[in-house]
């Protein structure tokens, strides 16, 4: 049996400053720095533009107090098996649910609600041991049978079904009261990452969920540090301290420290920052470069925790919708993506660098091969590619030869996002070959449009701080099964590469396989990129524990990675 420890399949190292990235230097091109016997990836240096190290909290924690945080949007729902979740949603979910596994500062995964996780030799059977004496908020005990009973709901869930398919999970069995055996149809060395994610890794009460699924989204029941108190959608969600929370620190402190946390969706970036500066809220989340710039200039009344790693802005083409089913159109539009101007419109000058793949240039998974395949700005080349499609009598959109193509370009209604989309619109329209319609929907609708495949050209964020399999494998999986294949592009070779990467713990081999996928995505022009996404939690002085949280075994976590997500169980308000 192989015991799963924090070193496995990690992306980076132990002190964050942008995703999982950290402060010890590593040359990505040097084989000697990679430990191929374990699957731990070496540490890397984060960009100078964003500098926040993750260090353990040293100040003595204090019980009591409340925090109100402004989020960039409302949660699509609070059912981990059903609702597609982004960063604001996970900020709420992480207060209510516990993950079975959690990411650590070394980039790998360690047990959280689990006590241990082991695999067989070919990574097709995983055995998980739960912590004893854990109860849900309604008093129901968490057992191995709970995990088994969750599985049918997850198989039918919109969010979990695609995650299950991508993980190759086929069966879940209770070995005893606290031992669960997961059986996979194929090898999957990255399976622990699935148990750290919401769709598969957040235990919920299956009986209550089956009895009233819609109600569960309003009154979710988890094992987490806080219990839902009230949920006023689009206004405020309030959670209060779980007096029976299982997590007791090495110093004997029963978590959490706070009495309550309030989550307020404030979609407008300026309004959200102003709410913090005026004292209406105590903290604010942002994934917008312009807001980080403004917060930096706001003075000493607030403190910033920043992070930049494997999260890149950009967008995608839905290949199920003509004319995006034709590579010539995708290449033509991508050659008209002026990354420098888009980054400036986003307010990211001096903060973000242009990206070419899902990994930042200082990350161990980044490759020159994928970077060289990325389509860079070439207006004349873009015109030539679009013209070839427009003049084709067999063009897929059914229009007459010579007619312009129609493009609906959609993004949420944030001013910087609108400005960035206007840069694209001006260049695309300026070719005199494209009719562009700009649309804006709130983030929840924007996500749902992608999930339901009614999108065309759609702005999006790409990447992730954990094992690449967690984000890439669902993206390349069968589009009929995986909702994460937002581009609806099915490539058997990419599926095979992802499967091969799942079947080995050799880092160099896995890195090449994911480089193949990133290169193919660029060659097919399925996505366009802008720059790396810096993220931020800004807060009033005195709020502690956001960035330096630890796991039950004392190991340091990953700070606010990914994408400005807070683990609320160790946050406290200092009295000093």
Would you name each region that the model predicts?
Residues 56, 60, 346, 375, ...:
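Extracytoplasmic/peripheral linker and loop segments enriched in polar/acidic and small residues
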Residues 67-121, 152, 221:
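N-terminal lobe/hinge region of extracytoplasmic solute-binding protein
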Residues 104-105, 196-256, 260-262, 380, ...:
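Gly/Pro-rich hinge or "lid" segments in bacterial periplasmic/extracellular proteins
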Residues 129, 163-208, 225-232, 335:
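Surface-exposed binding/hinge segments that line
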Residues 214, 245-294, 433, 442:
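Ligand-site clamp/hinge motif
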Residues 226, 353-392, 413-419:
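Structural transition elements
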Residues 388-464, 507:
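Ligand/substrate-recognition segments at binding pockets and active sites
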Residues 537-576:
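Long beta-strand-rich cores associated with HINT superfamily self-processing modules
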């Amino acid at each position: 049996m192989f015991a799963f420890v924090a070193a496995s399949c990690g992306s980076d190292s132990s002190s964050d400053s942008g995703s999982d990235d950290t402060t010890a230097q590593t040359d990505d091109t040097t084989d000697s720095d990679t430990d191929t016997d374990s699957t731990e990836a070496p540490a890397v240096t984060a960009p100078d533009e964003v500098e926040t190290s993750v260090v353990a909290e040293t100040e003595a924690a204090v019980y009591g107090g409340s925090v109100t945080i402004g989020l960039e949007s409302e949660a699509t729902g609070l059912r981990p098996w059903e609702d597609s979740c982004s960063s604001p949603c996970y900020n709420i979910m992480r207060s209510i649910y516990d993950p079975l596994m959690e990411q650590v500062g070394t980039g790998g995964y360690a047990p959280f609600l689990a006590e241990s996780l082991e695999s067989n030799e070919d990574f097709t059977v995983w055995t998980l041991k739960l912590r004893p004496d854990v109860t849900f908020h309604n008093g129901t005990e968490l057992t191995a049978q709970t995990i088994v009973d969750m599985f049918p709901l997850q198989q039918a869930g919109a969010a979990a079904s695609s995650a299950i398919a991508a993980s190759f999970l086929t069966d879940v069995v209770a070995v005893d009261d606290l031992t669960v055996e997961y059986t996979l149809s194929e090898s999957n060395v990255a399976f622990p990452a699935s148990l750290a994610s919401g769709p598969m890794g957040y235990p919920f009460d299956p009986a209550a969920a089956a009895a009233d699924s819609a109600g569960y989204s309003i009154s979710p029941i988890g094992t987490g540090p806080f219990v839902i108190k009230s949920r006023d959608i689009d206004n405020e969600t309030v959670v209060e301290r779980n007096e029976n929370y299982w997590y007791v620190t090495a110093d004997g402190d029963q978590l959490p420290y706070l009495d309550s946390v309030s989550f307020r969706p404030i979609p407008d970036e300026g309004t959200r920052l102003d709410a913090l500066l005026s004292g209406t809220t105590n903290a604010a989340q942002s994934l917008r470069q312009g807001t980080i710039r403004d917060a930096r200039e706001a003075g000493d009344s607030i403190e910033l925790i920043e992070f930049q790693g494997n999260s890149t802005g950009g967008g995608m083409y839905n290949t199920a919708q003509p004319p995006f089913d034709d590579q010539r159109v995708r290449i033509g539009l991508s050659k008209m993506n002026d990354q420098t101007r888009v980054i400036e419109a986003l307010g990211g000058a001096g903060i973000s660098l242009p990206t070419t793949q899902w990994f930042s240039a200082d990350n161990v998974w980044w490759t020159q091969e994928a970077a060289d395949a990325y389509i860079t700005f070439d207006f004349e080349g873009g015109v030539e590619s679009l013209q070839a499609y427009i003049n084709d009598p067999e063009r897929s959109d059914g229009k007459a030869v010579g007619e312009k193509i129609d493009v609906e370009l959609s993004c949420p209604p944030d001013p910087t996002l609108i400005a960035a989309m206007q840069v694209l619109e001006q260049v695309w329209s300026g070719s005199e070959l494209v009719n562009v319609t700009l649309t804006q929907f709130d983030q929840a609708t924007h996500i749902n449009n992608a999930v339901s495949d009614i999108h065309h050209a759609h702005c999006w964020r790409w990447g992730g701080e954990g094992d690449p399999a967690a984000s890439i494998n669902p993206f390349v999986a069968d589009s009929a099964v995986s909702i994460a294949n937002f581009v609806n592009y099915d490539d058997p070779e990419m599926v095979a590469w992802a499967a091969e990467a799942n079947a080995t713990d050799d880092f160099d081999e896995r890195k090449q396989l994911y480089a193949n996928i990133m290169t193919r995505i660029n060659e097919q022009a399925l996505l366009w990129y802008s720059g790396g996404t810096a993220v931020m939690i800004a807060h009033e002085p005195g709020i502690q524990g956001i960035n330096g949280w630890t796991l039950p075994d004392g190991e340091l976590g990953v700070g606010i990675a990914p994408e400005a997500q807070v683990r609320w169980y160790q946050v406290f308000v200092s009295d000093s």
